[in-house]
A protein has these predicted regions:
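Conserved phosphotransfer cores of two-component systems
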Residues: 109
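Glycine-rich, positively charged N-terminal anion/phosphate-binding segment
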Residues: 38-54
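Alpha-helix capping/helix-boundary segments
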Residues: 100-101
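Beta/alpha (TIM)-barrel catalytic core signal, keyed to glycine-rich beta->alpha loops juxtaposed to Asp/Glu
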Residues: 121
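Surface-exposed amphipathic alpha-helical tracts and adjacent flexible/coil segments at the periphery
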Residues: 1-23, 27-34, 53, 59-69, ...
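Conserved nucleotide-cofactor-binding alpha/beta core module
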Residues: 125-126
Length: 414
């Protein structure tokens, strides 16, 4: 039997990092303020990165830092300076896609693994063997690979070389995220972390011609072209492999990667908890996993998501993998609070969404139980007065319920 896979979660800031670990992640990948292909994310300051590494290692978890831009000449000295810093704080690995950046990493990083980012578009075993010879420890394979292709890759590479694959989250409609649409429309390059997501915009086909017109640019027409690989500019469903943990493990994937460094705390907690439970159930009792699939599917839909697809894992996806009529998410539960403190009667938190005395809320426990409880009393901490609801963002509140949560538990709507 293949080994138990690593569960790898994204984190956009230190709070989501702690939540990811609390709810079951074995490792997290994060980005600094530069070089990480997520310019819109809050990202981690240098001090945050050090704190993240220290926190992860204190809790026997791993931390991977992204440095996966395609560097231009004016980035090189900054990359060198950044890697000197990473060499001090010692993350477990750095993710890289650019070979110049790889060369700098080999020169400057000691005791830090190099992982090849999915941006490198790795689709065959010869590439992976080449990266191993250069000194890489792991490759994040392209999303465009099927499980059969991944299985074949595993059969042609060293046992020491690890394969990481995205198994849940948003999918880029362009090949391995190498998109120029954002750069063309707005001057902001996806390959430098500035993607404005034109693939999610609404477009019209004018007068039944095969021309593309974006709503805000009625005078600009673009001919629609499609080849055997499909069209590159429409709205993809989200990837979800929660029903196929057995096939992922059988293919030999070493690390199950979740997309979403810009996703919410509730999303990270929900997805981490569901995949943690599914992986553990499968490893411990395959029948238990199969019997719980409906429960996993129900739970994974309690965070915000687009309709789900299995992507390329079972062959090239057809038109059902895209969403043609809208770009909206399906809304799940609302995040009310994350418990900061507990005493004999009350628990304390900073409000995330409004709720009221008398409401029934749900505690997301770490052991996969969803515990319904009624709000009996609510006190504004700053005024010390009883209130009927908490309508203000970041309002500091303590409440009494008939069941007490634990520190770090998430409170959400039913």
């Amino acid at each position: 039997m293949n080994k138990k896979p690593e569960l790898l979660l994204p984190a956009g800031d230190i709070n989501t990092l702690k939540i990811a670990f609390d709810y079951g992640a074995d490792a997290c990948y994060v980005g600094g303020e530069l070089y990480s292909l997520r310019a819109k994310a809050i990202n981690f300051s240098d001090n945050d990165l050090k704190q993240a590494v220290d926190f992860a290692h204190k809790h026997n978890k791993k931390i991977y830092i992204t440095a996966n831009i395609y560097a231009h000449n004016n980035d090189i000295e900054g990359v060198r300076e950044y890697f000197h810093f990473l060499n001090i704080i010692k993350p477990d690995a750095v993710l890289i896609s650019d070979m110049g950046v790889f060369s700098i990493a080999k020169e400057l990083l000691n005791g830090i693994d190099i992982h090849i980012s999915t941006q490198a578009n790795t689709t065959n075993y010869e590439s992976i063997n080449f990266y191993e010879k250069l000194g890489a420890k792991r490759v994040v394979v392209a999303r465009e690979l099927s499980l059969n292709e991944i299985r074949e890759i595993k059969n042609h590479i060293s046992e020491n070389m690890e394969i990481e694959a995205f198994i849940h989250g948003s999918m880029c409609i362009s090949y391995s995220g190498r998109c120029l649409l954002s750069s063309f429309f707005t001057g902001k390059s996806a390959n430098l972390g500035e993607c404005t997501h034109p693939c999610r915009w609404k477009y019209d086909i004018k007068d039944k011609e095969f021309d593309l017109i974006e709503n805000e640019r009625p005078d600009e027409k673009f001919s629609i072209m499609e080849n055997e690989r499909g069209t590159y500019i429409f709205n993809s469903k989200d990837l979800c492999m929660i029903e196929h943990i057995d096939d992922l493990i059988d293919a030999g994937i070493d690390s199950f990667k979740i997309e979403g460094r810009m996703k919410s705390e509730l999303y990270i907690a929900t997805v981490a908890r569901v995949y943690r439970k599914a992986i553990d159930d499968y490893i411990n009792d395959k029948n238990l996993y199969k019997n719980n699939i409906d429960k996993y599917k129900e739970e994974i839909k309690k965070c915000t998501y687009r309709e789900y697809t299995t992507g390329f894992f079972y062959g090239y996806p057809n038109e059902t993998a895209q969403i043609y009529d809208n770009n909206t998410y399906v809304s799940g539960a609302k995040l009310y609070a994350i418990v900061d403190k507990v005493d004999n009667e009350y628990f304390y938190f900073e409000q995330k969404n409004k709720f009221s005395v008398g409401d029934t809320v749900e505690i997301m426990s770490k052991n996969f139980d969803n515990i319904k409880t009624k709000v009996l009393e609510m006190i504004d901490i700053e005024t010390g007065k009883n209130v009927d609801s908490c309508p203000h963002s970041k309002q500091k509140i303590k409440i009494k319920t008939d069941i007490m949560p634990k520190i770090g538990d998430i409170i959400r709507s039913i």
